[in-house]
């Protein structure tokens, strides 16, 4: 079972992973789809590569568990990114779906075993 400190570390790593992956994908999108240039896309590729290392620092030893749980963080984080960066307005179903995903994260990562 994870201690409080390890849960906080794990949660912080999930937030960092989300910033790197979602931010990296957004930078690639800006570079390619919004024609901002290859420097934007290149920065996105670097961020996406850095994201790939973050999972290795999770306190849980099971890659599949970590990546499955991160999927829920990615869903909620992507919606939040859209709100903050792109002016997206999620509807109640977006928010409900994100909440379900985050409950899943809690169960997958932090339920007693």
From Swiss-Prot:
- Cellular component per GO, a single term: plasma membrane
**InterPro entries tied to this protein:** UPF0060 (IPR003844)
Record's signal peptide: none
Q: Where in the cell is it found?
A: Cell membrane
Coiled-coil annotated spans? none
| One Pfam family here | UPF0060
Instruction: Could you list this entry's UniProt keywords, alphabetically sorted.
Output: Cell membrane, Membrane, Transmembrane, Transmembrane helix
Membrane-traversing stretches:
12-32, 37-57, 66-86, 92-112
Q: How does it sit in the membrane?
A: Multi-pass membrane protein
Q: Which family does it belong to?
A: Belongs to the UPF0060 family.
NCBIfam families according to UniProt = PRK02237.1
What protein am I looking at? UPF0060 membrane protein Mkms_2558
User: What is the scientific name of the source organism?
Assistant: Mycobacterium sp. (strain KMS)
């Amino acid at each position: 079972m994870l201690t409080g400190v390890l849960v906080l570390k794990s949660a912080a790593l999930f937030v960092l992973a989300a910033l790197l992956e979602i931010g990296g994908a957004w930078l690639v999108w800006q570079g390619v789809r919004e024609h901002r240039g290859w420097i934007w896309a290149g920065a996105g590729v670097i961020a996406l590569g850095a994201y790939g290392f973050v999972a290795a620092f999770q306190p849980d030893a099971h890659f599949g568990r970590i990546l499955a749980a991160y999927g829920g963080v990615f869903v909620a984080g992507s919606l939040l990114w859209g709100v903050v960066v792109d002016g997206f307005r999620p509807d109640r179903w977006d928010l409900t779906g994100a909440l379900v995903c985050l409950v899943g994260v809690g169960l997958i990562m932090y339920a007693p075993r």
